[in-house]
């Protein structure tokens, strides 16, 4: 069965907070988004250890730490203006559509 592309409520560059799981309460910036899998990679969240054999490209080998993807349903957008997690509404303006914080009404920055 083919994966269905899921509509994501967060974008690359957004500030988010993890609301469930072992990293609940941690904040970070979204580094990567995988809409087909419904997962996101967040800076300094869900760190896993990767054991690498020595190879020509990496002669040292060893154990490296990196961020692993987590389900996008486990994160919520974090508004830096009101310092709270929030849901997003979309407002139509002359310039186009903008994302707005539901708690304080401030336009959320578009990180492109």
UniProtKB/Swiss-Prot annotation:
Keyword annotations: Ribonucleoprotein, Ribosomal protein, RNA-binding, rRNA-binding
Organism of this sequence: Desulfitobacterium hafniense (strain Y51)
Pfam families: KOW (PF00467), ribosomal_L24 (PF17136)
SUPFAM superfamilies: Translation proteins SH3-like domain
Annotated protein name in UniProt: Large ribosomal subunit protein uL24
NCBIfam families: rplX_bact (TIGR01079)
Keyword Hydrolase: no
Keyword rRNA-binding on entry: yes
PANTHER family per the UniProt record, alphabetical: MITOCHONDRIAL RIBOSOMAL PROTEIN L24
Any single Gene Ontology cellular-component annotation: ribosome
């Amino acid at each position: 069965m083919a994966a269905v592309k899921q509509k994501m409520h967060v974008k690359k560059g957004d500030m988010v907070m993890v609301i469930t799981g072992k990293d609940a309460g941690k904040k970070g910036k979204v580094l990567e988004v995988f809409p087909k899998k419904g997962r996101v990679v967040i800076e300094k969240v869900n760190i896993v250890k990767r054991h690498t054999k020595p190879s020509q490209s990496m002669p040292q080998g060893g154990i490296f730490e990196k961020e692993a993807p987590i389900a996008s349903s486990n994160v919520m957008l974090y508004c830096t203006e009101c310092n709270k997690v929030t849901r997003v509404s979309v407002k139509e303006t002359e310039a186009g559509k903008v994302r707005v914080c539901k708690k304080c009404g401030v336009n959320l920055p578009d990180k492109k």
